[in-house]
């Protein structure tokens, strides 16, 4: 368990050539486990909509749902920097809305920074948030909240024009005051160029090895959901099958009267045994 990293230290780590490690968490138990690891940053992602709440996308996630999940994560990870996604509709209506809603997230949950999706068009909102004292992490490339507008969940920046736009997006977010930028699902060479063009750290997901850090969804990393594994995911464990096996063992032992056994039961004092 490392000492809690500060926002300025994120930038300093880039200068020193050190990699940032970020992982999602949505509840207290997983936050505790991450806090006991060497990972520096927890992202309470709006991916919880699909991973935890069973929605088809991140779009239905509400501000109240994000705050609800941020609270236990902050309590479970006192030694880890906690960043949270601003959900769709909470920051893209007006700058005033964005500031109001980001303030709610910080005040009510205890997170230290917010993440917003979008590039050049979102830069004025990022600047407004930063000027209001709210630290912001940017997010470019595949932006799940607007995936339909991008043609679905697919690699971005594959043409010269699209690649140039992503570079301009990153530079605009840096100029607006973002302390770091997530780059999602872009070619590795483009991510390398963007990373080299910025003084702030980039954190990749499906963006190759040249970013200043990496992020994964914790359920993907642990192999909990094994029906679909994105190309960019490495499963460091296969806990889904292990969990199912444990549940079936429990069900079988209860049905067979094996559990609970004597070792899981409470005894009675000698003077009471004859009464019951």
From Swiss-Prot:
Against InterPro entries, the record matches this protein to: Pantoate_hydroxy_MeTrfase (IPR003700), Pyrv/PenolPyrv_kinase-like_dom (IPR015813), Pyrv_kinase-like_dom_sf (IPR040442)
Pfam families assigned: Pantoate_transf
Q: Which residues form the active site?
A: 184
- Give the main location: cytoplasm
Task: Keywords in alphabetical order, please.
Answer: Cytoplasm, Magnesium, Metal-binding, Pantothenate biosynthesis, Transferase
Its annotated pathway reads:
Cofactor biosynthesis; (R)-pantothenate biosynthesis; (R)-pantoate from 3-methyl-2-oxobutanoate: step 1/2
Matching CDD domains = KPHMT-like
Per its UniProt record, the required cofactor names are: Mg(2+)
Q: Which domain of life is it from?
A: Bacteria
Question: Biological process (GO) annotations?
Answer: pantothenate biosynthetic process
Q: How is the cofactor bound?
A: Binds 1 Mg(2+) ion per subunit.
SUPFAM superfamilies linked to this entry = Phosphoenolpyruvate/pyruvate domain
**Which residues does the annotation say bind 3-methyl-2-oxobutanoate?**
46-47, 85, 115
Question: What GO CC terms are in its UniProt record?
Answer: cytoplasm
EC number(s): the record gives 2.1.2.11
Query: What compartments host this protein?
Result: Cytoplasm
Top EC group: transferase
Molecular function per GO = 3-methyl-2-oxobutanoate hydroxymethyltransferase activity; magnesium ion binding
Q: Where does Mg(2+) bind?
A: 46, 85, 117
Please write the reaction equations for the catalytic activity of this protein: 3-methyl-2-oxobutanoate + (6R)-5,10-methylene-5,6,7,8-tetrahydrofolate + H2O = 2-dehydropantoate + (6S)-5,6,7,8-tetrahydrofolate
Protein role: Catalyzes the reversible reaction in which hydroxymethyl group from 5,10-methylenetetrahydrofolate is transferred onto alpha-ketoisovalerate to form ketopantoate.
Family affiliation: Belongs to the PanB family.
Self-association and partners: Homodecamer; pentamer of dimers.
Which NCBIfam families does the entry mention? panB (TIGR00222), PRK00311.1 (NF001452)
Q: Know the name of this protein?
A: 3-methyl-2-oxobutanoate hydroxymethyltransferase
Name its species.
Answer: Heliobacterium modesticaldum (strain ATCC 51547 / Ice1)
């Amino acid at each position: 368990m490392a000492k809690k990293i500060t926002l300025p230290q994120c930038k300093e780590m880039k200068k020193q050539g050190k990699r940032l490690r970020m992982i999602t968490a949505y509840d207290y138990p997983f936050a505790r486990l991450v806090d006991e690891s060497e990972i520096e940053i927890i992202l309470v992602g709006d991916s919880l909509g699909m991973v935890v709440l069973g929605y088809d996308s991140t779009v239905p996630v509400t501000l109240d749902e994000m705050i609800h999940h941020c609270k236990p994560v902050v309590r479970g990870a006192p030694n880890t920097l906690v960043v949270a996604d601003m959900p769709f509709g909470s920051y893209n209506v007006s700058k005033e809305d964005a500031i109001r809603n980001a303030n709610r997230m910080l005040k009510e949950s205890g997170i230290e920074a917010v993440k917003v999706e979008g590039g050049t068009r979102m830069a004025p909102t990022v600047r407004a948030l930063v000027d209001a004292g709210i630290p912001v992490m940017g997010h470019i490339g595949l932006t799940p909240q607007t995936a339909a507008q991008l043609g679905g969940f697919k690699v971005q920046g594959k043409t010269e024009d699209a690649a140039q736009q992503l570079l301009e997006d990153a530079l605009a977010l840096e100029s607006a005051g973002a302390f770091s930028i997530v780059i999602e699902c872009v070619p590795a060479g483009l991510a390398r160029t963007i990373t080299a063009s910025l003084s702030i750290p980039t954190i990749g997901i499906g963006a190759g090895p040249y970013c200043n850090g990496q992020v994964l969804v914790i359920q993907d990393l642990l192999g909990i959901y094994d029906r679909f594994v994105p190309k960019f995911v490495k499963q460091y464990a296969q806990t889904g099958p292990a969990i199912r096996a444990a549940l079936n063992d429990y069900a079988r032992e209860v049905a067979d009267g094996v559990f609970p056994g004597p070792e899981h039961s409470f005894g009675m004092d000698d003077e009471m045994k004859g009464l019951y």
